């Protein structure tokens, strides 16, 4: 037996009076350390033939003593909660071939009810009536003595509950009451059971395992001990001051939270060819910065922002800009990125600026395209009075920019000079044939003068809204000073037309009238 004790590492334990092994003998239980006044405690532990010499050693006794000095508390829940420290023992002195049943029960340590006040436990009244005791049988029972002595006997699956109607076999306890666990070693009978008169058994009690049942930890020292020693006590770490300090330090260093103002400043300071006069409202960038701030994502904010785009967004039907007012002496024609490509560059070089971002469907006819272009041009119609003269191309300056009317609170900066032409109702547009080839051909001979029954279509390229007076007496304005192929052609119309297409007008019996300039 000494070899077994030395192999377990507790050879000196039986020499100490406090850690004396609980052997099966006929001594009163009060000598074993259990309270002698406890009504539920047996007054004696009996031993019978074949049960002599059995010794039990408590595993992790030092840890149990740490909790016992402070006042051990065990959580009880309705669903059941395991004990920590776990009840584990080392058993020696069993007959290797005899079958034994190991079981536990938890009995009241006294008849008092406790409360925790002023950082200590004190008696507050008489204990509630004890529930009928339940026994927890080890799952390996029955087993031979060789099986029990081969390794530690663990009761870690035992659960404590305060549900008096518990159907799962958990040990039922009352909160704020003190309890004492007990270990019973029973020799199995011929039916591998126990309970008969001749059943041999012995009981072992370790006073340092006594505890008070609670629904939540009362002593913060017990909480700290559970956190330090129980790797599964994560549920209590969130409310611990040390854990909160650690989490705050981790958030401040490893996962910094980027302020909203910093991200917005970086969004507005992105490089753009229009940064000298306009500031684009990038909605996607603002949304990204909000998610970044709220979620606390680390890393530079520029990684989550879209790269600076040197061109306007061609896929949007309407371009949103905020134009700032500037003085005349600070403004020149070369500083306007919208005016310069119209007057100084060819359509091929600045194609990406003024081409429509969405391709026209090839199956659509020319009349459908011109109608959609006419409606798009009407969408950008201004609300200025009809009597206001339209400025010519030479008169456009910085003073005219802020004075132009806005659509949807966004100033349209690409304003083109228009020549007044007779206006007809929209019903005439829907009955006409394709007029874009005819207008393109006429542009080479000058601007034709149309009669009262004639009308003229004009297409609107993306980001080139045409200013139009929508009064009943005003005429439809068409460009005069620009190169005709750049403004009048759509994507689906060829730029070289044969002469017989010049007069392809399907009006209501109308013949075009040519001016002297033609």
From Swiss-Prot:
Biased composition (Basic and acidic residues): 15-28
Keyword terms, alphabetized: Acetylation, Cytoplasm, Developmental protein, DNA-binding, Nucleus, Transcription, Transcription regulation
Amino acid composition bias (Polar residues), ranges on this chain: 269-301
GO cellular component, one term: cytoplasm
DNA-binding region(s), chain positions: 58-238
Entry-linked InterPro entries: p53-like_TF_DNA-bd_sf, T-box_DNA-bd, T-box_sf, TF_T-box, TF_T-box_CS
Superkingdom of origin organism: Eukaryota
Biological process terms in GO annotation: animal organ development; atrial septum development; atrial septum morphogenesis; atrioventricular bundle cell differentiation; atrioventricular node cell development; atrioventricular node cell fate commitment; atrioventricular valve morphogenesis; bundle of His cell to Purkinje myocyte communication by electrical coupling
PROSITE patterns per record: TBOX_1 (PS01283), TBOX_2 (PS01264), TBOX_3 (PS50252)
Location in or out of the cell: Nucleus; Cytoplasm
Composition skew (Low complexity), residue ranges: 34-45
Residues recorded with modification N6-acetyllysine: 339
PTM entry text: Acetylation at Lys-339 by KAT2A and KAT2B promotes nuclear retention.
UniProt region (Disordered), positions on chain: 1-46, 254-307, 330-352
GO molecular function, one term: DNA binding
Keyword Cell inner membrane found: no
Keyword Transcription regulation: yes
Function: DNA-binding protein that regulates the transcription of several genes and is involved in heart development and limb pattern formation. Binds to the core DNA motif of NPPA promoter.
Assembly information from the UniProt record: Monomer. Homodimer (via the T-box); binds DNA as homodimer. Interacts (via the T-box) with NKX2-5 (via the homeobox); this complex binds DNA. Interacts with GATA4. Interacts with KAT2A and KAT2B.
Domain notes: The T-Box domain binds to double-stranded DNA.
Name recorded for this polypeptide: T-box transcription factor TBX5
Protein's organism: Mus musculus (Mouse)
Recorded name of the encoding gene: Tbx5
